[in-house]
Design a protein with these regions (language model features):
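Sequence-structural signature of the catalytic-core scaffold of metal-dependent phosphohydrolases
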Residues: 1-39, 47-90, 99, 103-152
């Protein structure tokens, strides 16, 4: 009997989010991803709107949850998505903003001119891919729009 992997995270927007893949849970626990807990999704908005305290960690988990919903719906509609593709899609969306720095877009070009957060995201994903023995390659290909699903 195959034992299912399931971790549940209580999200302030979507409620309970289920993590179905050990590799995705490993990504969430990676120090590069955990740093997103300290990076504001809404920049300096909290100075005007005290309730604007959403962080990049919460945003990434919510985006991953919505991607999981989209994958499930596509499968219901007959679209074949392999387990590897599912993990790659979830990892790519989970890490899409990993390159953001303090206060997100508000300081993006002030700290290092001419460098976009997408470039930093790609560099961090490459480093994480090395840390994870190539386990992120499909996600990186998806992130860089280099993955093309083979036709059946």
């Amino acid at each position: 009997m195959t034992q299912l992997f399931r971790k549940i995270i209580n999200d302030p927007v979507y409620g309970f989010i289920t993590i179905r893949h050990p590799f995705i849970f490993q990504l969430i626990n990676h120090p590069a991803f955990q740093r997103l807990r300290r990076i504001s999704q809404l920049g300096l908005s909290h100075l005007v709107y005290p309730g604007a305290i959403h962080n990049r960690f919460q945003h990434a988990l919510g985006a991953m949850h919505l991607m999981q919903n989209a994958i499930d719906e596509l499968r219901v509609r007959g679209v074949e998505i392999t387990k590897a593709e599912e993990e790659g899609l979830l990892a790519a969306i989970l890490l899409h903003d990993i390159g953001h720095g303090p206060y997100s877009h508000a300081l993006e070009h002030s700290i290092v001119g001419g460098v976009h957060h997408e470039d930093i995201s790609a560099g961090l994903m490459d480093q994480m891919n090395r840390d994870l023995n190539g386990g992120l390659q499909l996600a990186i290909d998806i992130f860089n729009n280099q993955y093309h699903k083979p036709l059946s």
